[in-house]
Amino acid sequence: MVMATTLFLLAGLAEIGGGYLIWLWLRDGKPVYLGLFGAVALALYGVIATFQAFPSFGRVYAAYGGVFIFLAVLWGWWIDGKAPDTYDWIGAVICLVGVGIMLWAPRP
């Protein structure tokens, strides 16, 4: 459980961070090297996800989607300075509950 959570967090940081760097380059006129670093981070995200121990690609990526939503809310708040509202938090927590059910519910 700790390894799965760690990998989801690392993948999220790589994906959101990479996307943010590309956003800064294309939308905010920042230097092209930020876009290149962003592309590398996005590629790294794809690699990190393969280290998950769960056997199903679909389950891993669907569960990661819930983690991504929660991390994106935090990123927007801490890095981009946009405070989430109550509904953002409720939605993000619902997603995390879904992740827990998908990954750790008892299966035959």
UniProtKB/Swiss-Prot annotation:
The keyword Amino-acid biosynthesis does not apply. SUPFAM superfamilies: Multidrug resistance efflux transporter EmrE. It is a multi-pass membrane protein. It holds the Pfam family UPF0060. Its main location: membrane. Keywords: Cell membrane, Membrane, Transmembrane, Transmembrane helix. One of its GO terms (cellular component) is plasma membrane. It is found in: Cell membrane. The chain crosses the membrane at residues 6-26, 31-51, 60-80, 86-106. InterPro entries: UPF0060. It comes from the Bacteria. Belongs to the UPF0060 family. This is UPF0060 membrane protein BH2744.
